[in-house]
Amino acid sequence: MPALICGSLAFDTITTFPGRFAEQILPEQVHILNVSFLVPTLRREFGGCAGNIAYTLKQLGGEPLVMAAVGADGQDYLARFEAWGASTEFVRTVTDTYTAQAIIITDTDNNQITAFHPGAMQSAHLTAVPSGRQDIAIGIVAPDGRDAMLQHAAQFAKAGVPFVFDPGQGLPMFNGDELNAFVQQATWVAVNDYEGRMLCERTGKSLEALSNSHLKGVIVTLGAEGCEVWQKGQRTHVPGVKAAEVVDPTGCGDAFRGALLYGLERGWELTRCVELGNRIGALKIACRGGQNHVIDRAALAL
């Protein structure tokens, strides 16, 4: 059955500066900052949390249903979904703006300067989670426009669809009351360790307390160290999986969440879902971009 993935679709333009930002940006001159970086390499990737999650879920054999917005330049993304055999019925095209864009410059110290244009993402809230669909088994509220995240969470709850609250980099947009409302509406919460600390600070609740509630689990990713799973106040550590090589961490969290949705939709135990997520995250980090890793289902015994 389909998993409804609410989140962003974006194009990532990634460049490399063959020097150090520290040698180009003088601390005593930042008040008159005017710099230009020659970037001899450039690549464009399909990105955005919803797109990345959907890619992994589809590779695993799941059925992603993306709810997001693209701009007038979004035809390539729509064609990509159609090539997968994925439905675009909930992807809105906003003709008077661009698809969300991230423009990233990385230096030789792996420092990054990023400019982000939200574009069509600001209209994502105009598409609503359907209330009468019996075929949608599970959902996720991933980073998106602020209004979209608030409304889609409430709509999932009203429709009775279990969903993962995955605030990601969108977490700082919300205050404690709003985050508590998200948690009350959600079935699971997924964060990284930094986001987990911020969530606890803003809600005034520990991970133990958050999990000792109606939630079926709180998942905290720890990078190479694996993952913590909190259920009814009890913590379980699921070890990480060593990557063949570390090439690009972009989209690792999204790959993990695609695997998480795959397992949850099939009724797996949460720790088993997380184990698969750790394996897929290790696979993804060895590839550039968020949608280029290839998953061998037979090797995963799926």
Feature locations, PLM:
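Glycine-rich phosphate/adenosyl-contacting loop at the front of the ribokinase-like
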Residues: 1-65, 76, 246
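Ribokinase/PfkB-type carbohydrate-kinase core domain
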Residues: 1-20, 42-45, 65, 79-237, ...
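Short, conserved aromatic-histidine micro-motifs
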Residues: 30-37, 75-76, 139, 275-288
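Gly/Ala-rich phosphate-binding loop of Rossmann-like dinucleotide-binding domains
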Residues: 58, 157, 265
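Alpha-helical transmembrane segments within multi-pass membrane transporters and channels
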Residues: 66-71
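Conserved phosphate-binding/catalytic region of the ribokinase-like
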Residues: 204-302
